[in-house]
Each structure stands twice: as C-alpha cells, then as structure tokens.
C-alpha cells in the first residue's frame, strides 16, 4: 500500500549504527531493551524539551557487575549539569534506583543545533505550544536550517492548525529530500505539541547529502557524534569533533 517507513530505521546497518550498544544472550535481550526504554523515558522527563538531541547507552561488564555508560548530546550543557553538577548527579541517582546498576553519564555540547532534526522538531513544538502562528514557525525553522549548510529539509505538521474545527495536514519543503535513497544521510524526528485545541504532530526530515563509497555518515554532517563511526580511524573508536562538541565527564 506504499506506506512510508521510518528513515532512521531504514538506514540502520547501512550508513547508521544503533544508539544502544551492547550484546547479551537471547533470554536477556527483551529485559535489557525494556530497561533502555525506561532509562530514555526518565532522562527525557527529567529535562525540558529542546535540550537533548541524542541518548546513547553502552553496557560494560567489570567482573560480575554490569556498568552502564550513557552519552548525552545537548545544546544546553548548563541545564543538563546544573550548578555544581546537581542536575546531573540527581539524574544518576534516579537511574541507579530504577535499574539497580552503576551508571556514568558523559555530556557532549552540540553547537550546530539547526542541523539536528530532533532539536528542530522540539523547538517547533515548543513555539506551537506558545500559540505562535504555525506558518511563520515553519518558515523560520527552514531558513535557519538551510543557512547551516544542509542539502534539503521537509517539515510536516498535522492537527487542528490555527485552531480550525477540522484537522488537516500541511507541509513545506526546500532543497532535495530523497527518502528512498539509502546512501542519502537522512535525519528524521517526530514531536508532539500539546495545545489548548488539541495535539499537533510535527515531523522534520533533513538531508545532509549522500554517503559515497569510502566515506561515512560523519563526512556528510559537519557535526560528529559517537553515533556515527569514523571508519578511517584505525582503532575503530568513535570520533567527536572538537569544533562542535565539548565533553564533560565530571
């Protein structure tokens, strides 16, 4: 029937890698997947919207104890850490009580916020909740994204737009957004805006260019994160661009 698939999931194993990095026996996998979901939900509820762009979970084993390392990518590192790391330590305590395991949190500061679909979608949803006119919000978001150097962007919004009695769908796009080209580096995000006249759905699709042979997704994006493996690095470790990220492990 021609239903659209999630652009992020469609590219997993091809040009993208997973945000949960661990391996275990088959019997434990469902439990650990559920545990990851609880951790992500707790983190998202702990902080306000438009702060966290990505959450990575890594599970390590030291002797018989399981150790969890969480990488947070944020545009507002001060809110995540808080004064004297109070917010960060409070989050660690909550997660350790939830899963009864030791947790370490690493924080990376994202600079190019207009190129990340999650942050763009969250910012649009926040403005819609503040009763801003949706067409002006979409045009402003697209202009800022195009100025940051992306190849194309598409934003779709559905619901009772402008408080209309009948729900409808509106979209605006500029540039090239090839959803079915697997080598195209497509960043996709969905967010909900809860307004007084109902829930509005916001979808943001950003095209960063094509991942050509002998290149990785890190070459198409000017912002690098540990989600995107740098295959040119001999030790196969993940690469963080110092120009766009600042790491805090205090």
From Swiss-Prot:
The keyword Heme does not apply. GO terms for biological process: translation. It comes from the Bacteria. One of its GO terms (molecular function) is mRNA binding. One of its GO terms (cellular component) is cytosolic small ribosomal subunit. InterPro entries: KH_dom-like_a/b (IPR015946), KH_dom_type_2 (IPR004044), KH_sf_prok-type (IPR009019), Ribosomal_S3_C_sf (IPR036419), Ribosomal_uS3_bac-typ (IPR005704), Ribosomal_uS3_C (IPR001351), Ribosomal_uS3_CS (IPR018280). It holds the Pfam family Ribosomal_S3_C. Gene3D superfamilies: 3.30.300.20, Ribosomal protein S3, C-terminal domain. The keyword Signal does not apply. Keywords: Ribonucleoprotein, Ribosomal protein, RNA-binding, rRNA-binding. Residues 39-111 form the KH type-2 domain. Signal peptide: none annotated. Belongs to the universal ribosomal protein uS3 family. Binds the lower part of the 30S subunit head. Binds mRNA in the 70S ribosome, positioning it for translation. Part of the 30S ribosomal subunit. Forms a tight complex with proteins S10 and S14. This is Small ribosomal subunit protein uS3. It comes from Phytoplasma vitis.
